[in-house]
Amino acid sequence: MDDYTREMMDLKTLVTRTLEKKGVLAKIRAELRASVFEAIEEEDRVIENNEGPPPALLGSCNDRARKLHASPSGRLLSALICEYLDWAQLNHTLIVYQPESNLPKDSWKSELRDFNSNNGFELNRNGDSGPLLLDVLEGFLKFESMTQGMGSSSRRDSETESSSSLESRNPPRRSSASDSLPPQRRPVSASQASDRRAGLSTSGYRKDEFNWRQGNQDTHEEVTRASAALENLQLDRKTRNLTSSWRNVRDGTNEEEGRD
């Protein structure tokens, strides 16, 4: 290979890469395919006018797609796709898509006019707005989000109602551990505690009479009366002890005087 051929190949590679980076080559390819499809369509129309057979040259989609395109939902889907291609100015792709899908040329415009008139969409909108396919997709996603939110809230409400009904049927019960705990006592002073310990040995008072609960005014009054009774009892015992000891001392003195 001589130098001239090598330079031409390098130049061809450089031009091809530059065109691919700028998107020019892809546009040329799409335009070429669109031109080929247009030429074939024109030939099909000539044959149809002369002989009358239906054009079926570019029916390359499968049977499921043909059935879908024949249904109202399928026609709307194809119209939304064509409207997006037109919005994105992918004209060559649109030229290829319609005949390859067995769709009449510009049939999507009439389909969208019917859809817009039935649903209140604006067909002639500004270029800044998105395609109708985007609006349909956003509406579907918003509807799904609202449905899920309503479903979760209804589940929470049902769970709350079931839990409240269970609580109403089964009121809370005290645990066995709390039942085994001793009753709470009100704090008392040191003198009252000593008097209480001293009075435990008496026969007139028992331990159960000193179970106090906090916040009960009647119990506090009972504690006061019991403390006063204990003090009186202790005073009586001390008085009797002093009297008996004084009598013993007196009797001993009398005996000594009698001996003398």
Swiss-Prot record:
- Per the record, the coiled-coil ranges are none
Q: Where in the cell is it found?
A: Cytoplasm; Cytoplasm, Cytoskeleton
Compositional bias, Basic and acidic residues, is annotated for 248-260
Q: Does the keyword Cytoplasm apply?
A: yes
Low complexity: bias regions: 161-175
Region of interest: Disordered = 147-224, 236-260
Please give the superkingdom of this protein's source: Eukaryota
User: Predominant location of this chain?
Assistant: cytoplasm
Sorted UniProt keywords: Cytoplasm, Cytoskeleton
Asked whether the UniProt record includes Cytoplasm among its keywords, one would answer: yes
What the protein does comes down to: Involved in the control of the dynamic organization of the cortical cytoskeleton. May play a role in the organization of microtubule arrays at the centrosome through interaction with centrin 1 (CEN1).
Write down what this protein is called. Protein TONNEAU 1a
Specify the species: Arabidopsis thaliana (Mouse-ear cress)
Q: What is the lineage of its organism?
A: Eukaryota, Viridiplantae, Streptophyta, Embryophyta, Tracheophyta
